[in-house]
Amino acid sequence: MSLNIFWFLPTHGDGKYLGTSEGARAVDHGYLQQIAQAADRLGFGGVLIPTGRSCEDSWLVAASLIPVTQRLKFLVALRPGIISPTVAARQAATLDRLSNGRALFNLVTGGDPDELAGDGLHLNHQERYEASVEFTRIWRKVLEGENVDYDGKHIQVKGAKLLYPPIQQPRPPLYFGGSSEAAQDLAAEQVELYLTWGEPPAAVAEKIAQVREKAAAQGREVRFGIRLHVIVRETNEEAWAAAERLISHLDDDTISRAQASLARFDSVGQQRMAALHGGNRDNLEVSPNLWAGVGLVRGGAGTALVGDGPTVAARVKEYADLGIDTFIFSGYPHLEESYRVAELLFPHLDVQRPEQPKAGGYVSPFGEMVANDILPKSVSQS
């Protein structure tokens, strides 16, 4: 099976070490462009752009990098409760058109109640998933060209529609990750690709089986992806030494403060990440070549595959054997590590190389809208 391999744009910061300003790197547009262009040239299929108050806005970052890349796809965040589903559908169609079909969308419900409250969203975990289901139903239908009336518990729209369709038909794919039962129910009903963070294979297999069963009950099939860091070197010894260097500046106080901050999250996935290491820097290899050191101070994806190229490839194939076809990787610093992954890992995998998009992105093939709502009459050519 050919694998889709994505990279990551570190809009929340980058550097050689975790938890310290030593070796930190300024993340400006020029640096993000370097990473995006490297990923484009090296054969990564796309890049995940993170979201949240610690990050630059994912939509603006993607829009700024479209003109300087050729094949790379951009996986940007949809935020139910933060934006209207109808407006989000228009934005999605525009990004897809301007990128010539290189837009992908990642549904993010949020897991930090404090940050969500700051953004004006005051729903609990269950209510957020209820609202996300309503959001996604509307978003999908509008993008697929339907006129939508919807009267939900959290969202109501009347006469929602899209005048300019996306390039990808019937619409761009929707990605989503979540570990709670409510999240799995949403994935089974609404998304094309279900993402998990890098838990040990047995735990990932259990989640995949649960989502598959739920999707089958609705007559659907769902693809699967995984989000992992990678520390790959020419030898296993070098890789493990690099892993230790990455956290060499962490002290107990920094780890304790980070874990206390992450503990307020109501995200089940974040709780599962934290349980892998328990805030303890001892015994961080939680499964063969799966290292939980990143999660000591980083929220979200907290595990890395560590080893030489053949070893990491073997672990990737273990996940692929579970049904995973998409791998979203990252590494510190992200520019250099994109080359290491491409040079040391890609030769040992069947990597699906992205194709050059066909030309044809345009805004209006028919002239200006009449009264902002009506297509102009077409004129036959004789």
UniProtKB/Swiss-Prot annotation:
Q: Enumerate the Gene3D superfamilies for this protein.
A: Luciferase-like domain
- The signal peptide annotation in the UniProt record is none
Transmembrane segment boundaries: none
Pfam families membership: Bac_luciferase
**Biological-process GO terms, alphabetical:** alkanesulfonate catabolic process
Q: Which UniProt keywords apply?
A: Flavoprotein, FMN, Monooxygenase, Oxidoreductase
GO terms, molecular function: alkanesulfonate monooxygenase activity
Question: Reaction(s) catalyzed by this protein?
Answer: an alkanesulfonate + FMNH2 + O2 = an aldehyde + FMN + sulfite + H2O + 2 H(+)
Q: What is its EC number?
A: 1.14.14.5
What protein family does this chain belong to?
Belongs to the SsuD family.
Q: Which HAMAP family match?
A: Alkanesulf_monooxygen
Q: What does this protein do?
A: Catalyzes the desulfonation of aliphatic sulfonates.
Extract the NCBIfam families matched here: alk_sulf_monoox, PRK00719.1
Name-wise, this protein is Alkanesulfonate monooxygenase
Annotated source species: Pseudomonas putida (strain ATCC 47054 / DSM 6125 / CFBP 8728 / NCIMB 11950 / KT2440)
